[in-house]
């Protein structure tokens, strides 16, 4: 499990401090594929860097923290965000954007595998045994083992992306973060990458965190979704709930703007622009674009509230369902006994 607690991640720039994410809190469960969605600049990639512990200037963590809970020989171990970098590859790995810029252009793929796995228990296998394991693993992922002898420029974009996923999952980490894993790939290759990710997650029974601006990617493979807007979490729910019963006006407008098969009706985008994260508004950050907004929305920042079991929304216009109110009443009653 990953617990994200009130994380605020900022950037220092010559124009001022960019509040890329602010007071972000939610939990990522074991054995799930969770998606993080939202417009460009909403804080998705910044949040991924914070979770991975890859925080470098000008980015810094202004508040909050992150905990990874992992099982080590039958005992629970808590890893804080200050320690996460020590457990890269072993417990948590990251599949970044832009496959060509990730792979070293002057090294063969096999050498990049060998350089990545410096853990003593892995290296103890010996080079030839390790290369054989790599070849076997590539076959499992339906990749020809011959790619181990190739240079990155000799592989297609889709093949490079598959190699990066293989690199990230070779030692079966508990958490795999993938940032826009299908960007710049054609539809057929995208489908192959998504199928690969789903099959890997089922095989490894681990947790995948997928960042994508493409709602279709989330619809196809994620179990739950986190919708972000202007550095804040707007909504969290099961993926089917997000698509069938969106509660936040921003999510609703995102879903309404998606094209439908067999529907030639022109879809309207969301009018207006997100607020500047150099000086975000004090109230709801979506208020200036929201059809439900009133004066209170511009002044009061909404909290993330559970409106239905497992369905969280940050909107002053949405209230907990009768079921949630009844549960809260029972909890209060027990507390007063």
Can you say where each PLM-predicted feature lies in the sequence?
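The feature captures the beta-strand-to-loop junction immediately N-terminal to the Walker
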Residues: 37-39
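ABC ATPase NBD coupling module
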Residues: 72-93, 119, 241-246, 276-281
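Conserved ABC ATPase "signature" region
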Residues: 128-146, 255
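A short, proline-enriched helix->beta-strand linker immediately N-terminal to the Walker B motif
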Residues: 170-174
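P-loop NTP-binding/switch modules centered on Walker-like glycine-rich loops
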Residues: 181, 185-265
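Short catalytic/signature loops enriched in Gly
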Residues: 236-337
């Amino acid at each position: 499990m990953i617990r994200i607690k009130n994380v605020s991640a900022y950037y220092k720039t010559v124009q001022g401090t960019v509040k890329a994410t602010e007071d972000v809190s939610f939990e990522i469960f074991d054995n799930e594929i969770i998606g993080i969605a939202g417009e460009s600049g909403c804080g998705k990639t910044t949040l991924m860097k914070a979770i991975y512990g890859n925080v470098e200037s000008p980015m810094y963590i202004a508040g909050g923290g992150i905990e990874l809970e992992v099982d080590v020989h039958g005992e629970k171990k808590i890893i804080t965000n200050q320690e996460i970098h020590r457990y890269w590859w072993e417990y948590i790995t990251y599949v970044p954007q832009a496959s060509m810029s990730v792979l070293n252009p002057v090294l063969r793929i096999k050498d990049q595998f060998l350089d990545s796995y410096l853990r003593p228990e892995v290296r103890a296998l010996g080079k030839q045994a390790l290369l054989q394991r790599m070849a076997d693993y590539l076959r499992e992922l339906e990749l020809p083992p011959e790619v181990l002898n190739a240079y990155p420029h000799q592989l297609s974009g889709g093949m490079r992306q598959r190699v990066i996923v293989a690199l990230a999952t070779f030692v079966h980490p508990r958490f795999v973060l993938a940032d826009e894993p299908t960007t710049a790939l054609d539809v057929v290759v995208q489908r192959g990458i998504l199928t690969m990710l789903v099959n890997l997650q089922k095989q490894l029974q681990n947790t995948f965190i997928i960042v994508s601006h493409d709602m279709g990617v989330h619809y196809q493979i994620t179990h739950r979704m986190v919708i972000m807007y202007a550095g804040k979490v707007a909504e969290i729910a099961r993926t089917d709930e997000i698509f069938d019963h969106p509660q936040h006006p921003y999510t609703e407008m995102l879903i309404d703007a998606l094209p439908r098969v067999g529907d030639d009706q022109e879809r309207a985008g969301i009018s207006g622009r997100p607020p500047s994260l150099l000086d975000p508004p004090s109230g709801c950050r979506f208020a200036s674009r929201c059809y439900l907004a009133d004066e209170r929305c511009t002044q009061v920042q909404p909290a993330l509230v559970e409106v239905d079991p497992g369905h969280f929304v940050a909107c002053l216009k949405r209230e907990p369902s009768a079921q949630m109110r009844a549960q809260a009443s029972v909890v209060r009653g027990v507390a007063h006994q």
